Curated annotation (Swiss-Prot):
Protein name: Histone H2A type 3
Modified residues (N6-(2-hydroxyisobutyryl)lysine): K6, K10, K37, K75, K76, K96, K119
Principal location listed in the UniProt entry: nucleus
Gene for this chain: H2AC25
N-acetylserine modified-residue sites: S2
UniProt modified residues of type Phosphoserine: S2
Superkingdom classification of source: Eukaryota
List of residues that carry Phosphothreonine: T121
Keywords linked to the UniProt accession: Acetylation, Chromosome, Citrullination, DNA-binding, Hydroxylation, Isopeptide bond, Methylation, Nucleosome core, Nucleus, Phosphoprotein, Ubl conjugation
Family per similarity comment: Belongs to the histone H2A family.
Single annotated GO MF: protein heterodimerization activity
Region called Disordered, residue ranges: 1-22
Length: 130
């Protein structure tokens, strides 16, 4: 009965991406390919791209969360580079991680030196003499 093809065999399971198996949005397969092609080492373990994709996804989510808050504070619904800059520079750990990074169209943090501010004078509501 040759030539009849597969009849009683198991149906092949629907393909499931490594990203969905790991519960991630970032592409594990693409990260794995980039690790292999990037000449970082001769061999790349199966867990390394999953871990790296998870770290990248976490950092991205953290930055976007803070940038979204900055956009909302400025009464905007769209995140622009300025909001990313404000989010990163106002967060101590992200600022340290991305300290040498320049964000195009990001601007600078508003900062006025204390010595340039007008001096505070005593209030005019002093009790007058007898």
């Amino acid at each position: 009965m040759s030539g009849r093809g597969k009849q009683g065999g198991k149906a092949r399971a629907k393909a499931k991406s490594r990203s969905s198996r790991a519960g991630l949005q970032f592409p594990v397969g693409r990260v794995h390919r980039l690790l292999r092609k990037g000449n970082y080492s001769e061999r790349v373990g199966a867990g390394a791209p999953v871990y790296l994709a998870a770290v990248l996804e976490y950092l991205t989510a953290e930055i976007l969360e803070l940038a979204g808050n900055a956009a909302r504070d400025n009464k905007k619904t769209r995140i622009i580079p300025r909001h990313l800059q404000l989010a990163i520079r106002n967060d101590e750990e992200l600022n340290k991680l991305l300290g040498r990074v320049t964000i195009a169209q990001g601007g600078v943090l508003p900062n006025i030196q204390a010595v340039l501010l007008p001096k505070k004078t005593e209030s005019h509501h002093k009790a007058k003499g007898k």
